[in-house]
Amino acid sequence: MSRVIAIANQKGGVGKTTTSINLSACLAEKGKKVLLIDMDSQGNTTSGFGFEKNELDKTIYEVLREEVSIEEAIIPVEECFENLFLIPANRNLAGAEIELVTRENMQHILKKQLEPIKDEYDFIVIDCPPALGMLTVNAMTAADSVLVPIQCEFYALDGLSQLIYTIELIQESLNPDLYIEGVVFTMYDARTNLSLQVVENVKDNLKQIIYKTIIPRNVRLAEAPSYGLPINLYDKRSSGAEAYRMLADEVIENAK
């Protein structure tokens, strides 16, 4: 059975796209068939795999507009793993928030599009935009669960509380089975008191849904996208690669 996981946080710069790319690649490395959907108009997930995003004419934007089928928009990321696939995004997606508002059953468009292909994959990972608009609502309506990356910074808990409120609203009206897959700490620096305090603070409030894996602040993680590679191919022995492999193990275990 396929699992659809939305990776979301309305705060930017928390490691959401980094987590989307590297979790998907590590799941593929472990033999899982993975579809990664870029739902962010910045298209950083798309360019993070080396694709020229603005040269693509079949993206998630055209899928949501129902101009192309979802199968037509899927790109194999065979330079990385033969069982890893991507639905790309580019700047065209920026207009989708406004366009979707006028559509009938606008919150369910992505879910409807995924239905014919959902069972072909072990995991479908959706990289949500850093906002709680219609694109994120579509992703969460289509998802089984939400994975939340949190940067180890002072305002981490404030952003999380807003996201949890949004998830509760979607549970009430659109997707009653949606749940929080887990919270993963990113950009963790054990040398700073702030990182330690943030981890302890969030654990005190949400202990039951926090992943054991903590993603460290790692130079190689920051470098990898400029080479169009996930961390487990760019530097497979780096601390970032090891951390995302451990996170993939936890996600696989949770799916059993």
Residue ranges of each PLM-predicted region?
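P-loop NTP-binding core
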Residues: 1-256
